[in-house]
Amino acid sequence: MNNIIKMLNEEQMKTDVPQFGAGDTVVVKVRVVEGGKERLQAFEGIVIAKRNRGVHSAFTVRKISNGEGVERAFQTHSPIISSIEVKRRGRVRRAKLYYLRERSGKSARIREKLATK
């Protein structure tokens, strides 16, 4: 029984998910159905939380839109996610960046992680 569940979970997992973590700026392309048409909508922001649980993995992205903070939680292996692109790597010392909710402007900035040679 346990092997069957494990096999089904592995079957549903995507293989094209890039490596990213809290502090990284990502662009998530989401499939949106409006009327009868399907289009891709980009959601760009900072990853403030990531949960690694196999097929149940999820992450939360936060962005500032018109001066208002917007957060959206995504299931990593969901079929509505078309692609995930990492724009920039952030250097942070926490796994969850919930403290960014209370901050704005310069205090909400995240240092960039420079690539090592």
Swiss-Prot record:
GO biological process, one term: translation
Keywords annotated in UniProt: Ribonucleoprotein, Ribosomal protein
InterPro entries: Ribosomal_bL19, Ribosomal_bL19_CS, Ribosomal_bL19_sf, Translation_prot_SH3-like_sf
Membrane-spanning segments: none
GO MF, one example: structural constituent of ribosome
Pfam families linked: Ribosomal_L19
GO cellular component, one term: cytosolic large ribosomal subunit
Function: This protein is located at the 30S-50S ribosomal subunit interface and may play a role in the structure and function of the aminoacyl-tRNA binding site.
Family the UniProt entry places it in: Belongs to the bacterial ribosomal protein bL19 family.
Name of the protein in question: Large ribosomal subunit protein bL19
